[in-house]
Amino acid sequence: MKKAILSVSNKTGIVEFAKALTQLNYELYSTGGTKRILDEANVPVRSVSDLTHFPEIMDGRVKTLHPAVHGGILADRNKPQHLNELSEQHIDLIDMVVVNLYPFQQTVANPDVTMDEAIENIDIGGPTMLRAAAKNYKHVTTIVHPADYQEVLTLLRNDSLDESYRQSLMIKVFEHTAEYDEAIVRFFKGDKETLRYGENPQQSAYFVRTSNAKHTIAGAKQLHGKQLSYNNIKDADATLALVKKFDTPATVAVKHMNPCGVGIGDTIEQAFQHAYEADSQSIFGGIVALNRAVTPELAEQLHSIFLEVIIAPKFTDEALDILKQKKNVRLLEIDMTIDSNEEEFVSVSGGYLVQDKDNYVVPKEEMKVVTEVAPTDEQWEAMLLGWKVVPSVKSNAIILSNNKQTVGIGAGQMNRVGAAKIALERAIEINDHVALVSDGFFPMGDTVELAAQHGIKAIIQPGGSIKDQDSIDMANKHGIAMVVTGTRHFKH
């Protein structure tokens, strides 16, 4: 029977994963809080102490740091000497290690964190097990991200979890532990960058990097330009988060934390042109992110307008020569890998709020057409584009989009009709192929009526109002196709 050690701080999906492993004939071992959760779920699991024959000591500081654990993980199964030594010491082989670490980054994100709290959240046993298992990836499966659970199970069930896949997991482990160690160094080193000022000149500010992950703003490589300002950093972070949602060539332009233009295309040059045309006035002085390399042709387009920051996964040498003609524009090169951090933090007086990131995307097949008229294919494309953008717009938010760009954005209004008025009045085009997208439900039918007056023929919204039928009836009255997603996307 194969053996797996499970010890996680992020308990997302661990019960379901553990149950599936037992069905695949794995014997499970665990520690502390992970074992308690599995016990409560009636998942067969043994304590790591059953492997080590040694109790957890020092409030759990020492529990897996033992030869019975690390010998079973590190043994090279192609070396008879290793296997003989395990047999002599009565040590069992460990086939899988599932570990994620104490939440150090989340802990030190609290401005009031004490030194003792920070120290207690430095994981020792977890990184040691991860590194040991990753080193021996030829024989041991190592999982650090809950997002990988399902794929691992699928491969195990198909008997296709091979060395190449284990190597890909190994790379994730060393990336994770490197980021973790970097965060510790930065915290204790006091790695903060003093900024010229904060949101306004009368406010002092500095930038604390808790992670040097190359796919974040904190880990961006600045190739040119002035120091990033407080507002640049916030806007750049918002721009990067949105552009990463797109697989096709895409461009996002942001001003004051709100998208002002989003475009997609067959090429990145087309995508930029669509984003620029979406609001050629507001993009002036904005932040632009592109999810493809900046070519000389694109650089000429970017150079022709005033931009504060340009973000891309790569700039060609020729593109850099063009863009560097403006001495102040900030050029940031960033890996467009999706950020694995699943939580976000907001400080409030006396504390801070923590929540999961709003990354959920409703599959099209789960969306419901609730009107007599169904959307055309082109209207569906417009809806899905807008639905991808609307979580990044301050509420109340209304977006108008076609199948290649946003064409009007109404952001941050105190009522939904007000947001719709702004989007409709600023729209660069309205025709049968343009969809109206709402981040929240319609409390009554007035927004739909306003949309009808402007010629809108397709609407997508979460639904959930006690007066949903009023909006549906209004849509039917005007021959509008309406889709309900069941998921809202407020942003404050």
Swiss-Prot record:
Listed GO MF terms: IMP cyclohydrolase activity; phosphoribosylaminoimidazolecarboxamide formyltransferase activity
Domain named MGS-like: residues: 1-144
Pathway: Purine metabolism; IMP biosynthesis via de novo pathway; 5-formamido-1-(5-phospho-D-ribosyl)imidazole-4-carboxamide from 5-amino-1-(5-phospho-D-ribosyl)imidazole-4-carboxamide (10-formyl THF route): step 1/1; Purine metabolism; IMP biosynthesis via de novo pathway; IMP from 5-formamido-1-(5-phospho-D-ribosyl)imidazole-4-carboxamide: step 1/1
Gene Ontology, cellular component aspect: cytosol
Reactions catalysed according to its record: (6R)-10-formyltetrahydrofolate + 5-amino-1-(5-phospho-beta-D-ribosyl)imidazole-4-carboxamide = 5-formamido-1-(5-phospho-D-ribosyl)imidazole-4-carboxamide + (6S)-5,6,7,8-tetrahydrofolate; IMP + H2O = 5-formamido-1-(5-phospho-D-ribosyl)imidazole-4-carboxamide
The protein's Enzyme Commission number: 2.1.2.3, 3.5.4.10
UniProt cross-references to PROSITE patterns, sorted A to Z: MGS (PS51855)
Keyword Transit peptide in record: no
Keywords (A to Z) from UniProt: Hydrolase, Multifunctional enzyme, Purine biosynthesis, Transferase
Keyword NAD on entry: no
SMART domains per the UniProt record, alphabetical: AICARFT_IMPCHas (SM00798), MGS (SM00851)
Protein origin, superkingdom: Bacteria
GO biological process, one term: 'de novo' IMP biosynthetic process
InterPro entries the record matches: AICAR_Tfase_dup_dom_sf, Cytidine_deaminase-like, MGS-like_dom, MGS-like_dom_sf, PurH-like
Domain remark from Swiss-Prot or TrEMBL: The IMP cyclohydrolase activity resides in the N-terminal region.
Family note: Belongs to the PurH family.
Official protein name in the record: Bifunctional purine biosynthesis protein PurH
Species of origin: Staphylococcus aureus (strain Newman)
